[in-house]
Design a protein with these regions (language model features):
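Short coil/turn segments at secondary-structure junctions
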Residues: 9-10, 45
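Perimembrane loop-to-helix junctions flanking transmembrane segments
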Residues: 1-8
Length: 175
């Protein structure tokens, strides 16, 4: 194996390195485009970030504690799939914030997360149970985070509105 192919195989998993974050990015993009969401900007930003930190942190701790070998024998960080955990956490965040606007937003988020999971197994980076655990982890932590946020931050009316019109960014603040 050449050095170039080894470095690409070792440090880049390809498209799923980017796709895992797309559902989370979509939460902020849809909100910025003015699509009606469940929560105001502050609560959305705090809750979405907290769900990512809880999911990514827990996946990292489990990977370094359990030390399950990957199917390709490259390292002992197979369980759970962090890519899948992040993708499903983002998909669940997308569903929580925009699922009532259109069910297709939820379908797109979970479809993308499922693609990431299947791709991780197809690339021989994870066993099926690694991605199943990652999906469950991402879903559960996001549900818990949204439940807790409703207890800590009661819903308020939107005080900041951001939107795009043509080539301008519009910001309105309610005082």
């Amino acid at each position: 194996m050449s050095l170039e192919s080894w470095s690409q195989q070792r440090y880049s998993d390809g498209l799923d390195d980017v796709l895992q974050y797309l559902p989370y990015a979509s939460v902020f993009a849809l909100k910025a485009c003015g699509v009606e969401s469940r929560d105001d900007w502050k609560k959305l930003a705090i809750t979405t970030t907290a769900s990512w930190v809880a999911t990514a942190g827990t996946a990292w701790i489990l990977k370094h504690s359990i030390k399950e070998w990957r199917p390709d024998d490259s390292d002992q960080k197979s369980f759970p799939s962090g890519h899948t955990a992040i993708a499903f956490a983002g998909a669940t965040a997308l569903h929580k914030e925009f699922g009532k606007v259109s069910p297709w937003i939820s379908v797109a988020g979970y479809g993308l997360a499922t693609f990431v999971a299947v791709d991780r197994v197809a690339k021989d980076r994870h066993h099926w149970y690694d991605v199943a655990a990652g999906a469950g982890l991402g879903f559960a932590f996001t549900e818990i985070t949204w439940w807790l946020s409703d207890k800590v931050f009661p819903r308020q009316k939107e005080t900041i509105a951001i939107g795009f019109s043509g080539n301008t960014l519009d910001v309105a603040v309610k005082l």
